[in-house]
Design a protein with these regions (language model features):
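Conserved alpha-helical substructure of the radical SAM core
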Residues: 1-138, 149-153, 158, 162
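Conserved nucleotide-binding/hydrolysis micro-motifs of P-loop NTPases
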Residues: 146
Length: 164
């Protein structure tokens, strides 16, 4: 397995929007495999369960059947989306189907790349291998501190920082 650290934004291969609008296919599509999260970060609305209930946002993971329907619908675009981002406000690794979602999107050719952002608390070597084998192109790790104390203060999670 070969991995590299790279900037999150690729300034060299960006599409100048003024050359492609109006778009017939989205460049980037965000799908949230999980509306739930195992952290309670101060900056994130997902940590406020009362607010999430008030706005009608469920606290659950996306069912594979729904993801399969979305992928089937994506085939109606004129071309593949550039990036399918499998994250938004929840922790994507809470979804047990995450590797299968990555694999399906790649196999069906509905996107050029699949990426995700995770707090990495659920990322084990075994899970990492499954996700890589499924075809994930990029994983961003959201680091909420540089010590156990900072993590606890910021995300309300007791965590051994060295485990991330």
């Amino acid at each position: 397995m070969k991995a590299e650290f790279a900037p999150r934004i690729d300034l060299h291969n960006r599409t100048a929007l003024e050359t492609v609008i109006p778009l017939d296919t989205p460049l980037v599509l965000f799908l949230d495999p999980s509306d739930a999260c195992n952290f309670k970060c101060k900056f994130c609305p997902t940590s406020d369960r009362k607010l999430m209930k008030e706005v009608g946002r469920p606290w659950r993971t996306m069912k594979m059947e729904l993801f399969e329907k979305i992928v089937a619908d994506m085939k109606n675009f004129n071309r593949p989306v550039e990036v399918l981002r499998l994250y938004k406000d929840g922790e994507p690794l809470l979804n047990k189907n995450f590797p299968a979602m990555v694999r399906l999107a790649k196999q069906e050719g509905v996107c050029n790349r699949v990426d995700t952002t995770t707090n990495a608390s659920l990322l084990t070597p075994e899970r990492g291998e499954k996700i890589i084998e499924a075809g994930l192109d990029r994983i961003n790790i959201s680091i909420e501190g540089i010590s156990n104390e900072q993590y606890k203060n910021f995300s309300d999670v007791k965590l051994e920082f060295s485990s991330i």
